[in-house]
Amino acid sequence: MTRYIFITGGVVSSLGKGITSASLGAILEAQGLTVTLLKLDPYINVDPGTMSPFQHGEVFVTEDGAETDLDLGHYERFVNATMTRKNNFTTGRVYADVIRKERRGDYLGGTIQVIPHITDEIKAKIREGADGADVALVEVGGTVGDIESLPFLEAIRQMRIELGDQQTLFIHLTLVPYVAVAGEIKTKPTQHSVKELRSIGIQPDILVCRSEQPLPDAERAKIALFTNVPEPSVISLSDVKSIYEIPLILRDQGLGNRVCEKLNIKATAADLDDWKKVVQAQKNPRHTVTVAVVGKYVDLEDSYKSLSEALIHAGIHTQTRVVIEYIDSEAIELHGTELLKKVDAILVPGGFGSRGIEGKILAAQYARENGIPYLGICLGMQIAIIEFARHKAQMENANSTEFDPKTPFPVVALVSEWMAKEGIIEKRKWGDDLGGTMRLGGQPCRLKIDSLARRLYGEDRVIERHRHRYEVNNDLIGELEKKGLVISGRSIDDRLVEMIELADHPWFVGCQFHPEFTSTPRKGHPLFIGFIKAGLAAKEAKKAVLAAPSQEKTD
């Protein structure tokens, strides 16, 4: 029997419902329970796949090829369960499915309404996503009081009635602000947020109160009194330097035990030793390395959320504090590569569109010519191919057909056909819809013997997640290989280039897939760990060069 924990948010958005849900999931998993997490998004887009990163942040790709909310990335980084397309759905998807059923005649001519048809569909999707787990944590996007969230809140209210309080539990995440002018912590916003939630029929069982500092006992007692929540169930969650401390903080306040008690679950004590090691390693680095992330969405760091976390994970596993310098590729176009002079390694992430492309190409050229470790992900690999073709293979004006359809050397072109992981041939053509038509999800990759990629992974075949519409043009690969480009990874059917590297460079790697989606704080990822180690080596080599003249004078 699956138990359901519904997590809502109040007062303001961006309080950290996703991190809190994932942290509670980690605690319950450490107590011996099988856990899954769902995210219900109230926007009308079918999925975030075609949304601007500036509006939505990163699109997280699941193993089965769904384009989902970035919170699913948090879920996978905190728990061992793998998310699927069933773990995230939107208002748009719910309405699309209901309308499809109506057109098919499933409702036998009835009038389709929010209640019961939309709410029934929401409940069915929640049950489907939770199937097989001991506990399903269901995060409701948005803020209580938003009109968009009402169908989701109504659906979970109905689930409490249908399943009872031994199988459902409500957690409300709320803000308790500190007003500096008055010198006081204010509980009134939380009181009103709970009042709003109760007005639609939901009484929270547990409150998680976000604040700058830990809540004093007096304020916790006051919140408990005015919200009808027992004082032990008012949890204080103050700001922390690392999100990986949160499972420990919530465990120490007894949240996991409180949940198990309310849901009548017999569970063991939570063993969070792995999380203690992660936090200790992050707090006590022995080295520092500076990485330039050259992109065009750098004004919103959530656009590269999994990427920044993967670099942090690599730092944890190399005892290194990773300083990330986000550099706008258009700034490099304007001011040149001076912006890259002080970094130890360069990373060009994925992206779409022609804006800022030449700046990324300059960054790849700078890394190649100066022996600086380079990691190109998705578009970043394609950028490296374009740069190499132009400046090493004498292919003047080489480009991707995404940016220049009339380029004389289309070294990167539209992927028209590929073999999916299941052995099915997928096909795409110009003019297809943008949404859901890319090469998506986990795809197998075969690594070349004696390549850097093979050494980093320690195996000859890996599965990594993809999200792209363009690929390296096989017709021009031979010319590039003659000039020193190494194709170190290919798709299983040999049709697509998955990884490249340079034989005459200390560490220059490009991958068509997104390794950041499978990095976790407890395991890291071999590509990022190798990249950070290379950055440290480059930093030490630079120090040695700078020290050499003074050494000669001493001699």
Swiss-Prot record:
GO molecular function: ATP binding; CTP synthase activity; glutaminase activity; identical protein binding; metal ion binding
Reactions listed under catalytic activity: UTP + L-glutamine + ATP + H2O = CTP + L-glutamate + ADP + phosphate + 2 H(+); L-glutamine + H2O = L-glutamate + NH4(+); UTP + NH4(+) + ATP = CTP + ADP + phosphate + 2 H(+)
Binding of CTP, residues: S13, D146, I147, E148, K186, T187, K188, P189, T190, Q191, K222
Binding positions (L-glutamine): G351, L379, G380, M381, Q382, E402, R469
Origin superkingdom: Bacteria
Positions contributing to ATP binding: S14, L15, G16, K17, G18, I19, D71
Chain positions recorded as UTP binding sites: S13, K186, T187, K188, P189, T190, Q191, K222
Positions of Mg(2+) binding: D71, E139
Span of domain Glutamine amidotransferase type-1: 290-541
Family: Belongs to the CTP synthase family.
Function: Catalyzes the ATP-dependent amination of UTP to CTP with either L-glutamine or ammonia as the source of nitrogen. Regulates intracellular CTP levels through interactions with the four ribonucleotide triphosphates.
Protein name: CTP synthase
Annotated source species: Coxiella burnetii (strain CbuK_Q154)
